[in-house]
Amino acid sequence: FRKAERVIDFFVNYCITENGWVYSLYDTEKGAPFASFGDASAPRLHYMYYEKCKGNYLRTMTEPMLDLLEAYLWYRKKGVKKEKWLESVIRFANFLLEKQNADGSWCRAYSMTGEPVYMNDREDYTTEENDRGRKASTIIPVMFLCALANCLGEEKYLQSAKKAGNYALGHEVRWELYQGGTMDNPNVVDKEASQYMMAGLYHLYQMTKSPEYLEGALCAAKQFVTWNYIWNAPMRKGNILFSRGFCTKG
């Protein structure tokens, strides 16, 4: 438990900024965190790159903060209150509320000052297609906000989650178009997007008992399982997985 506490305390002390924006990467050699994109001096960890500003993705900020909330709740059950952890969780949640668009969406990435980053717009796409790509990760914070609303009993976090869920129902579930779940590209359909949609809407259903959220979760789930059991993702020639005849089914 002590070792786990030290790891979590390190994350809280060094990776969460005053405005709620979150680092998800840390360079142990330099002794400093670094941005997921836009930091020329940092290790390049992904083929997608953006040089105009430093920032992080909505997904890679939300995932560790949900873990932090779960850790807080686990320790609380053991009779140990980690108030600094909860304060950090709330700071990020308030960052989300502040950055949520009027239509209920969030952008896929944000600069360190909290400005939305549009890194993959395409000239051959319509305005609607580019806008949908910019907001393709909207469902991702919903589980986190539902969990926090349940923890604190504060309606504002549930209302924010519902706004995001309603946006997702109208712009993604309605068209059965689940894209932008990975960091690769906001306009690529992927299994993570349908998985997050399923999980986020199901959490909303559990919190509200509104049937439209359960129906949306089921719709996303039907596409998600095809990635696990039917769809055999192609492998690029020259890749070691291709040479071994690797299959993604099952």
Role assignments for model-derived ranges:
Residues 1-250:
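Glycan-recognition and catalytic cores of secretory/periplasmic carbohydrate-active enzymes
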